[in-house]
Amino acid sequence: MIQMQSTLDVACNSGARRVQCIKVLGGSHRRYAGIGDIIKVSVKEAIPRAKAKKGDVYNAVVVRTKKGVRRPDGSVIRFDRNAAVLLNNNLQPIGTRIFGPVTRELRNEQFMKIVSLAPEVL
C-alpha cells in the first residue's frame, strides 16, 4: 500500500535511485496505490549524469510492495521493499532495463513492456 509521502526504490535504469510518492492517480480522493497502480513521484536521490535528475516529477507504476497482492487461489506475494518503475507521459518506461522480480498482475494492465523486460515474473 503506497500513499502520499511514501518512499520507493526505483526498479529501472532511468538514473533515479529513490522516489517519493506525491499523488495517487485515479479518483479524486484515492488514498492508496497497490501493485500495477500509477502514481506521481518526485525524484529524491539520483545518480550523476542520468536521465532522471533530483527534483524531477514523473509518473510511475508500482511493481513491488511490502503489503503484497492476493491471488485468487488465496496465496499472497509480498516483497521486502516497495519499488516502482518511472514512466514518461505516454506511460512507457523511461529505462531500458528492469531490476528485480515483478508480479503477473502487471500483465493485465498496459505494462507488457515492463513484464517483458523483467528478469523474473512471479
Swiss-Prot record:
State the source organism's domain of life: Bacteria
Asked if the keyword Ribosomal protein belongs to this entry, the reply reads: yes
List the record's Gene Ontology CC terms alphabetically.
cytosolic large ribosomal subunit
What are this entry's molecular-function GO terms?
large ribosomal subunit rRNA binding; structural constituent of ribosome
- Keywords, ordered alphabetically: Ribonucleoprotein, Ribosomal protein, RNA-binding, rRNA-binding
Do you know which Gene3D superfamilies this protein is assigned to?
A: Ribosomal protein L14 (2.40.150.20)
Q: What family is reported?
A: Belongs to the universal ribosomal protein uL14 family.
What is this protein's function? Binds to 23S rRNA. Forms part of two intersubunit bridges in the 70S ribosome.
Under which name does UniProt file this protein? Large ribosomal subunit protein uL14
Question: In which organism is this protein found?
Answer: Shewanella baltica (strain OS155 / ATCC BAA-1091)
Point out the gene that encodes the protein: rplN
